């Protein structure tokens, strides 16, 4: 886990219901439109920055200066175009 990874106790993460592992998130109860809940994760979200950081950790527009796990999910998940 990178030192600058978003923690689930981070105030912004709590507000957005971010979980590092989408399977342990509220994505089924709070599913967003675009894909079935089980297919919603940070890797296919429009807020994820695909050009940043390591393989499993990327930047996110919602958590400036921090990294999210591609297997994560938050309540702002929005399907990336394309």
From Swiss-Prot:
Annotated residues that bind [4Fe-4S] cluster are located at: 42, 45, 60, 74
Q: Which organism is it from?
A: Marichromatium purpuratum (Chromatium purpuratum)
UniProt keyword Electron transport present: yes
The UniProt family comment states: Belongs to the high-potential iron-sulfur protein (HiPIP) family.
Entry keyword set: 4Fe-4S, Electron transport, Iron, Iron-sulfur, Metal-binding, Periplasm, Transport
Question: What is the role of this chain?
Answer: Specific class of high-redox-potential 4Fe-4S ferredoxins. Functions in anaerobic electron transport in most purple and in some other photosynthetic bacteria and in at least one genus (Paracoccus) of halophilic, denitrifying bacteria.
Show the InterPro entries listed in the entry: High_potential_FeS_prot, HIPIP_sf
Cellular component GO terms, alphabetically? periplasmic space
Q: Name one Pfam family in it.
A: HIPIP
Compartment(s) where it occurs, according to its Swiss-Prot or TrEMBL record: Periplasm
Give yes or no: UniProt keyword Iron-sulfur.
yes
One GO molecular function term of this record is: electron transfer activity
* Domain of life, per lineage: Bacteria
**Could you identify this protein by its name?**
High-potential iron-sulfur protein
What GO biological process, any one, is recorded here?
aerobic electron transport chain
Q: What is its main location?
A: periplasm
Tell me, how does this one assemble?
Homodimer.
């Amino acid at each position: 886990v990178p030192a600058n990874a978003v923690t689930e106790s981070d105030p912004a993460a709590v507000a957005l219901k971010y979980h590092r592992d989408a399977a342990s998130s509220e994505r089924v109860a709070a599913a967003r439109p675009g894909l079935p809940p089980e297919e919603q994760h940070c890797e296919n979200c429009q807020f994820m920055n695909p050009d940043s950081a390591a393989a499993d950790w990327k930047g996110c527009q919602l958590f400036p200066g921090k990294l999210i796990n591609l297997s994560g999910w938050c309540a702002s998940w929005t399907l990336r175009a394309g």
